[in-house]
């Protein structure tokens, strides 16, 4: 019998959730996703120090010798994310997701500006917009930024998505893809209820993605659904048939080593009609979020976590720049 990974690949686009190029080479995904935490983890690996140096050198050359180190580091942060993205694109046939600075999550204009800057860096190296997804947190401000960007043919992946109403707002904005989180929802419910586990069919994260998928398909939305943030392979197999699933190398390995039958669970051609199409404005969106303690807490936690990862990455870049150029290290 074929592995679960091979069977899953026949019904769902498998995406690698990592910045580790060696893991991507091993599992041959179609697409790949990165985020600040994954880039930070990869940047700790000796194998990727040359990419850090490349980002710093390019940024210094771009800004000039008179530019302050703090400005070079900030430029290098964007450059490093794109450098990793370009290396990933050499290994996959599809798209890479590169994330906008999470510290801009509540600033629509700044998010738009940063996204344009990121895509321009890819374009300058001959990479078309169709091969890049700009990851943006699913705040109201982020969703509105994505709505503008999509009209400019800059494709967006709305991340840190924890409830149905975030998904609806994204679909109404016409975004290319959403990343509803599974494992982080499970984490919250386990902590809130004191339960050690949930059967996969009752897993709150699985239930959430299933509802979103069926709503999108039954109402004709083109926005792709990519389940994310998995804690075990049972969550993944329960979502077999979802448009895409982005999976960590550890769970990709488990799927590759497990041989059992995998039935399709989600079918875009035969969605369950769960409710009629609804419409959200900013007021109704914020009311729905305010009434969902889990989604509000996890969105805030996610933005905070990614922001801290960016701070750490900037500090690492600063230290590396000091080694390259000499002088006293600057605390950012």
From Swiss-Prot:
Catalytic-site annotation from UniProt: 135
Record GO terms (molecular function): transaldolase activity
Superkingdom of origin organism: Bacteria
Record GO biological process: carbohydrate metabolic process; pentose-phosphate shunt
Catalysed reaction, written as an equation: D-sedoheptulose 7-phosphate + D-glyceraldehyde 3-phosphate = D-erythrose 4-phosphate + beta-D-fructose 6-phosphate
Disulfide cross-links: none
Entry's EC annotation: 2.2.1.2
Pathway linked to the protein: Carbohydrate degradation; pentose phosphate pathway; D-glyceraldehyde 3-phosphate and beta-D-fructose 6-phosphate from D-ribose 5-phosphate and D-xylulose 5-phosphate (non-oxidative stage): step 2/3
Cell compartment(s), UniProt: Cytoplasm
UniProt keyword Membrane, yes or no: no
HAMAP family: Transaldolase_1
Subunit text: Homodimer.
Function: Transaldolase is important for the balance of metabolites in the pentose-phosphate pathway.
Name of this chain's protein: Transaldolase
Gene name in the database record: tal
């Amino acid at each position: 019998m074929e592995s679960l990974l091979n069977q899953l690949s026949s019904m769902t686009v498998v995406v690698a959730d990592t910045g580790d190029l060696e893991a991507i080479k091993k599992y041959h995904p179609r697409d790949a996703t990165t985020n600040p935490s994954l880039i930070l983890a990869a940047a700790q690996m000796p194998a990727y120090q040359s990419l850090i140096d490349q980002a710093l050198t390019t940024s210094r050359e771009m800004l000039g010798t008179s530019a302050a180190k703090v400005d070079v580091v900030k430029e290098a942060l964007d450059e490093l994310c794109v450098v990793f993205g370009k290396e990933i694109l050499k290994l996959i046939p599809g798209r890479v997701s590169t994330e906008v600075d999470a510290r801009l999550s509540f600033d629509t204009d700044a998010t738009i500006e940063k996204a344009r800057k990121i895509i321009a860096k890819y374009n300058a190296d001959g990479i078309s917009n169709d091969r890049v997804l700009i990851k943006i947190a699913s705040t109201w401000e982020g969703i509105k930024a994505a709505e503008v960007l999509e009209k400019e043919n800059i494709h967006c992946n709305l991340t840190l998505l924890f409830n149905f109403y975030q998904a609806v707002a994204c679909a109404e904005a016409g975004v290319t893809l959403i990343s509803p989180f599974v494992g982080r929802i499970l984490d919250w419910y386990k902590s809130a209820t004191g339960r050690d586990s949930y059967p996969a069919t009752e897993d709150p994260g699985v239930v959430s993605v299933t509802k979103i998928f069926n709503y999108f398909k039954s109402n004709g939305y083109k926005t792709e659904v990519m389940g994310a943030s998995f804690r075990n392979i049972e969550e993944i197999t329960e979502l077999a048939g979802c448009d895409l699933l982005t999976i960590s190398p550890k769970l990709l390995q488990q799927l590759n080593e497990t041989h059992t039958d995998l039935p399709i669970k989600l079918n875009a051609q035969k969605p369950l009609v769960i409710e009629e199409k609804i419409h959200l404005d900013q007021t109704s969106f914020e009311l729905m979020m305010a009434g969902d303690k889990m989604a509000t807490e996890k969105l805030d936690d996610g933005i905070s976590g990614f922001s801290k990862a960016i701070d750490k990455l900037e500090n690492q870049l600063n230290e590396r720049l000091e080694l390259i150029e000499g002088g006293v290290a600057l605390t950012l």
